[in-house]
Amino acid sequence: MVSSNGSQCPYDDSFKYTLYGCMFSMVFVLGLISNCVAIYIFICALKVRNETTTYMINLAMSDLLFVFTLPFRIFYFATRNWPFGDLLCKISVMLFYTNMYGSILFLTCISVDRFLAIVYPFKSKTLRTKRNAKIVCIAVWFTVMGGSAPAVFFQSTHSQGNNTSEACFENFPAATWKTYLSRIVIFIEIVGFFIPLILNVTCSSMVLRTLNKPVTLSRSKMNKTKVLKMIFVHLVIFCFCFVPYNINLILYSLMRTQTFVNCSVVAAVRTMYPITLCIAVSNCCFDPIVYYFTSDTIQNSIKMKNWSVRRSDSRFSEVQGTENFIQHNLQTLKNKIFDNESAI
């Protein structure tokens, strides 16, 4: 499908339908399984929950809500027709932005919580409570839903292909970008990306500096290694999933408002947009890795389950070995009796 950005740069972006269909199918399977397992562990397996667990539960719920909309998107990208109505189109768009920026903010909450626990372990006791964590989570949900509301307002289904099919998730008109969306993108990028990015990098740097102080050298190397792994995994997932898309979104907004009209740059930005969006969506699959490295209780639960499985397997092997030993002795005894009878 050849489209235009409102300037003299026609561009064929039809490759995005195949890319979205394949990537969203994979994210649906992996994201559904991993986040369902995570929520089961959080709710059913963990006996003790703290404020970090509260953030992770909300992050998993945000991922699942978006994952549940993926089958509708997959159908649309496969058939290029949206038969599910305007309301479901708006809900799907809202949950996309809610998930992306909700994930960014909840990951930032986890990073700040870790910073307070390690850098100010005693002073932060009154702040790091489950009640305060719940209040923060409610504030995050209101923020991301409020931020995604304008996109929902402007997004709607429309006829395409001589009125033979309905379209959803397609781009907004150039006039809408110039009047409203460019300002909304600026707000979203500042509140939902740049401030959280600065907080994540700053908190991680402060934690690393605290761990390297002579006062903390007495701490076990194992605990320091755990924290270092935690910070590394957290930052890698955050930067890998969200930095490319949000940087490209800024360039895309500039392109749609015709701030620059160089056709080579326009083609590069439009090509990278669906690719970076797919990378951002993959955060649903990577968030459970954050849960594992962040929570000792989750690691212990998984290790306990593996230990119980191995223990049951070893018990089964012992029982089976004992039965084989008894059967072997009985067979030997029978053979001896038979030999004695034959000798008589």
UniProtKB/Swiss-Prot annotation:
<dbReference type="GO" id="GO:0004930">
    <property type="term" value="F:G protein-coupled receptor activity"/>
</dbReference>
<feature type="transmembrane region" description="Helical; Name=5">
    <location>
        <begin position="184"/>
        <end position="204"/>
    </location>
</feature>
<feature type="topological domain" description="Cytoplasmic">
    <location>
        <begin position="294"/>
        <end position="344"/>
    </location>
</feature>
<feature type="transmembrane region" description="Helical; Name=1">
    <location>
        <begin position="26"/>
        <end position="46"/>
    </location>
</feature>
<feature type="disulfide bond">
    <location>
        <begin position="89"/>
        <end position="168"/>
    </location>
</feature>
<dbReference type="Pfam" id="PF00001">
    <property type="entry name" value="7tm_1"/>
</dbReference>
<feature type="transmembrane region" description="Helical; Name=4">
    <location>
        <begin position="135"/>
        <end position="155"/>
    </location>
</feature>
<dbReference type="GO" id="GO:0043231">
    <property type="term" value="C:intracellular membrane-bounded organelle"/>
</dbReference>
<keyword id="KW-1015">Disulfide bond</keyword>
<keyword id="KW-0675">Receptor</keyword>
<feature type="glycosylation site" description="N-linked (GlcNAc...) asparagine">
    <location>
        <position position="162"/>
    </location>
</feature>
<feature type="topological domain" description="Extracellular">
    <location>
        <begin position="156"/>
        <end position="183"/>
    </location>
</feature>
<keyword id="KW-0812">Transmembrane</keyword>
<keyword id="KW-0564">Palmitate</keyword>
<protein>
    <recommendedName>
        <fullName>Lysophosphatidic acid receptor 6</fullName>
    </recommendedName>
</protein>
<feature type="transmembrane region" description="Helical; Name=7">
    <location>
        <begin position="273"/>
        <end position="293"/>
    </location>
</feature>
<feature type="glycosylation site" description="N-linked (GlcNAc...) asparagine">
    <location>
        <position position="262"/>
    </location>
</feature>
<feature type="topological domain" description="Extracellular">
    <location>
        <begin position="78"/>
        <end position="90"/>
    </location>
</feature>
<comment type="similarity">
    <text>Belongs to the G-protein coupled receptor 1 family.</text>
</comment>
<feature type="transmembrane region" description="Helical; Name=3">
    <location>
        <begin position="91"/>
        <end position="111"/>
    </location>
</feature>
<dbReference type="GO" id="GO:0001835">
    <property type="term" value="P:blastocyst hatching"/>
</dbReference>
<feature type="lipid moiety-binding region" description="S-palmitoyl cysteine">
    <location>
        <position position="284"/>
    </location>
</feature>
<keyword id="KW-0472">Membrane</keyword>
<feature type="topological domain" description="Cytoplasmic">
    <location>
        <begin position="112"/>
        <end position="134"/>
    </location>
</feature>
<dbReference type="InterPro" id="IPR000276">
    <property type="entry name" value="GPCR_Rhodpsn"/>
</dbReference>
<feature type="topological domain" description="Extracellular">
    <location>
        <begin position="1"/>
        <end position="25"/>
    </location>
</feature>
<feature type="transmembrane region" description="Helical; Name=2">
    <location>
        <begin position="57"/>
        <end position="77"/>
    </location>
</feature>
<feature type="topological domain" description="Cytoplasmic">
    <location>
        <begin position="47"/>
        <end position="56"/>
    </location>
</feature>
<feature type="topological domain" description="Cytoplasmic">
    <location>
        <begin position="205"/>
        <end position="230"/>
    </location>
</feature>
<keyword id="KW-1003">Cell membrane</keyword>
<keyword id="KW-0449">Lipoprotein</keyword>
<feature type="glycosylation site" description="N-linked (GlcNAc...) asparagine">
    <location>
        <position position="5"/>
    </location>
</feature>
<keyword id="KW-0325">Glycoprotein</keyword>
<dbReference type="InterPro" id="IPR017452">
    <property type="entry name" value="GPCR_Rhodpsn_7TM"/>
</dbReference>
<keyword id="KW-0297">G-protein coupled receptor</keyword>
<feature type="glycosylation site" description="N-linked (GlcNAc...) asparagine">
    <location>
        <position position="163"/>
    </location>
</feature>
<dbReference type="GO" id="GO:0005886">
    <property type="term" value="C:plasma membrane"/>
</dbReference>
<keyword id="KW-0807">Transducer</keyword>
<feature type="topological domain" description="Extracellular">
    <location>
        <begin position="252"/>
        <end position="272"/>
    </location>
</feature>
<feature type="transmembrane region" description="Helical; Name=6">
    <location>
        <begin position="231"/>
        <end position="251"/>
    </location>
</feature>
<comment type="function">
    <text>Binds to oleoyl-L-alpha-lysophosphatidic acid (LPA). Intracellular cAMP is involved in the receptor activation. Important for the maintenance of hair growth and texture.</text>
</comment>
<keyword id="KW-1133">Transmembrane helix</keyword>
